[in-house]
Amino acid sequence: VEFFFLRPKDIAIYVARGVLDLGITGRDLALDSKASFDEVLPLGFGGSTFRYAAPQGEEWDISQLDGRRIATSYPNLVRANLAEHGIEADVIRLDGAVEISIRLGVADVIADVVSTGTTLRQQGLAPFGEPIIESEAVVIKRTGVEVSEEEQVVLDRMQGILHARTYLMIDYNIAQSNLDAAAGTTPGLTGPTVSPLAREGWVAVRAMVPKKNANQVMDRLSQLGAEAILASDLRIARF
């Protein structure tokens, strides 16, 4: 396996031309490139929205964009969105510092990637309308080309890391008399692993639980009399 570090904006083009088998880039960047690709796996990081924004205090909606100047680093995404709404506008491509273009008189509104909104607020801007697109880092492949066996191995390994990030491994000791109730709280994927302890009438239990539910699960186990409750991160998991 060879890895190439390229400009995120160019990755979809390399994949579409068959130069690369798989690529990791932002969904927004891939779509703006107008390259032909298939999204294979969302990776759950680098999340953002692509929004229109205007000076704070001004009331805007997308119907008012007809004939206006719109500054953006993603002209193809903007043109496609405007076309969907039957709007013609002057789309001005800028490679950076899009937020300041209104203050400098270059544009009436902007269209830009918004993560936390801090940069927009610092420039006195506020988003309006529905998001043009919701983006995150994704794995892409060339359209119409089947994933090879070697590529599937790479994808499975990535998916294993994503699975591991959403689960914790819970270990605890509990009285045999409370095992059924505890197992109902920690069912795992196909059932918890139960092992006898030297302490008579007690067992050790291990199960995977969704990370988002970990505190509630541990609270419930405590109520059931469980002891030595431990939660461990997973590095990789195959389901």
Protein language model annotation of sequence segments:
Residues 1, 5, 25-38, 44-45, ...:
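Small-molecule-sensing regulatory modules
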Residues 13, 49-53:
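Signature of uroporphyrinogen-III synthase
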Residues 1-19:
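Short, structured active-site "lid" loops
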